[in-house]
From Swiss-Prot, chain A:
Family: Belongs to the ATPase A chain family.
InterPro entries: ATP_syn_F0_a_bact/chloroplast, ATP_synth_F0_asu, ATP_synth_F0_asu_AS, F0_ATP_A_sf
Keyword Cell inner membrane applies: yes
Residue ranges crossing the lipid bilayer per the database entry: 28-48, 89-109, 140-160, 203-223, 229-249
Gene Ontology biological-process entries: proton motive force-driven plasma membrane ATP synthesis
SUPFAM superfamilies per the UniProt record, alphabetical: F1F0 ATP synthase subunit A
GO CC terms: plasma membrane; proton-transporting ATP synthase complex
Location relative to the cell: Cell inner membrane
Native source organism of the sequence: Colwellia psychrerythraea (strain 34H / ATCC BAA-681)
Protein keywords: ATP synthesis, Cell inner membrane, Cell membrane, CF(0), Hydrogen ion transport, Ion transport, Membrane, Transmembrane, Transmembrane helix, Transport
Membrane topology: Multi-pass membrane protein
Subunit structure: F-type ATPases have 2 components, CF(1) - the catalytic core - and CF(0) - the membrane proton channel. CF(1) has five subunits: alpha(3), beta(3), gamma(1), delta(1), epsilon(1). CF(0) has three main subunits: a(1), b(2) and c(9-12). The alpha and beta chains form an alternating ring which encloses part of the gamma chain. CF(1) is attached to CF(0) by a central stalk formed by the gamma and epsilon chains, while a peripheral stalk is formed by the delta and b chains.
CDD domains recorded: ATP-synt_Fo_a_6
Lineage: Bacteria, Pseudomonadati, Pseudomonadota, Gammaproteobacteria, Alteromonadales
Name of the protein in question: ATP synthase subunit a
């Protein structure tokens, strides 16, 4: 409990799940989610770019080894699933995997650490400090990523199959008879929309739930330490797994978009 | 869930990051990895080749060694034969030389003996004449009686 006895558990959790927001309604921006997201993206690109600049095919340094392990892992995943030629898929998968991994990792930061740091540095009262540091526990972030993937799915579907081919794919299956084409279209549209929705909601749901449990654990007093440790250890599985699933499904969806029936 | 401009901001960041990654991050790293993989593959292939070469060289060396042994044995054989031949030849020559020397010796001895005998015979003739002169106590005309003397000499 951070803000003293005046807060009930519900108020404490609600407070911690509120974003640092500027603007109103649709035009609002979550500064904490977007800020951490961009910061972590820049961390990823800075590290990888510094390795890329000095990349040698000779004996690699330790950082290059680590980066090459990640790149090799992503490259293997892409090559095992996507068989076409596309210069975008692999770097896209790398960005998704590492970026989401870093964003998910913010789940390990103790829930009260950042608000207290801000309180300590700026002197703002804790009740006014809103800081939700896990970007992937914000649906805006996960839907932003999923929307990007969705646009790519549509783009490559049309690019590879043409508008006609894409429409044909949406209408002529699973039922072959012309009278059922509208039904097909509805089914296929739902399938198509389910892809980005499931991508975004799966990631968001896992991380939001994880964050919520961390907050619940933070309200139980002194026993929170071992419980917190257990839950954090469990996230050793959840965090990379969710990043991997998002990347893998992106590759699968794009690979489906490239398949011409 | 309130969906707002954060989503658009995230989408823009996503696009920018992916483009940056595609242009400046992925190609150099994957290039270095693939280049190294090629180098390692080449190195492994080269070591395989070298091992094969070594095996071949060893086989060749063994074969050459065997051949050399056979050759050496045949050379020794030939040398032994040659030696035996030389010994035989030399022995033959020595025998011939010995016989030749013996023959010469015999011939010389024979000549010497004949000569000595001739001299002896002449001396005996002279002694016989001298004895006859003494017996007859008169001088015998050597010229008148030379035919008798010659006959005597021939009889000796």
């Amino acid at each position: 409990m951070s803000s003293g006895a005046v807060l009930t558990s519900q108020e404490y959790i609600t407070h911690h799940l509120s974003n640092l927001k500027v603007g109103e309604g649709f035009w609002a921006v979550h500064l904490d989610s977007l800020g951490w997201s961009v910061f972590l993206g820049l961390v990823f690109l800075t590290i990888f770019r510094s390795v890329a600049k000095k990349a040698t095919s000779g004996v690699p340094g330790k950082l290059q080894c680590a980066v090459e392990m990640v790149v090799g892992f992503v490259d293997d995943s892409v090559k095992s699933t996507f068989h076409g030629k596309n210069a975008l898929i692999a770097p896209l998968s790398l960005t998704i995997f590492v970026w989401i991994l870093l964003m998910n990792s913010m789940d390990w930061v103790p829930v009260d650490l950042l608000p207290h740091l801000i309180h300590w540095v700026t002197g703002m009262p804790l009740g006014d400090i809103y800081m939700k540091p896990v970007p992937t526990a914000d649906p805006n972030i996960t839907f932003g990523l999923a929307l990007g993937v969705f646009i790519l799915i549509i783009y490559y579907s049309i690019k590879v199959k043409g508008v006609g081919g894409f429409m044909k794919e949406l209408t002529t299956q699973p039922f072959g008879h012309w009278s059922l084409y509208p039904v097909n279209f509805i089914l296929e549209t739902v399938t198509m929309l389910a892809r980005p929705l499931s991508l975004a909601l799966r990631l968001f749901g896992n991380l939001y739930a994880g964050e919520l449990i961390f907050l619940l654990i933070a309200t139980i007093g002194v026993f929170q330490l071992p419980v917190h440790f257990l839950w954090a250890a469990f996230h050793l599985l959840v965090i990379p797994l969710q990043a991997f699933i998002f990347m893998m499904l992106t590759i699968v969806y794009l690979s489906l978009a490239h398949e011409d029936h | 869930m309130d969906i707002n401009m954060t989503l658009v901001g995230q989408l823009i960041a996503f696009v920018v990051f992916v483009i940056f990654c595609m242009k400046y991050v992925w190609p150099p790293i994957i290039g270095a990895i693939e280049e190294r993989q090629a180098t390692i593959a080449d190195g492994l292939a080269a070591s395989d080749r070298a091992a094969k070469d070594l095996e071949l060289a060893q086989e060749k060396a063994t074969a050459q060694l065997k051949e050399a042994k056979v050759q050496a044995a045949s050379i020794v054989d030939a040398a032994k034969k040659h030696e035996a031949k030389i010994v035989e030849e030399t022995a033959g020559k020595a025998q011939a030389e010995k016989e030749r020397i013996l023959a010469t010796g015999h011939a010389e001895i024979e000549t010497e003996r004949n000569r000595a005998r001739e001299e002896l015979r002449k001396e005996v003739a002279i002694l016989a004449v001298a004895g006859a002169e003494k017996i007859l106590e008169r001088s015998i005309d050597g010229a008148a009686h030379s035919d008798i003397l010659d006959k005597l000499v021939a009889e000796l």
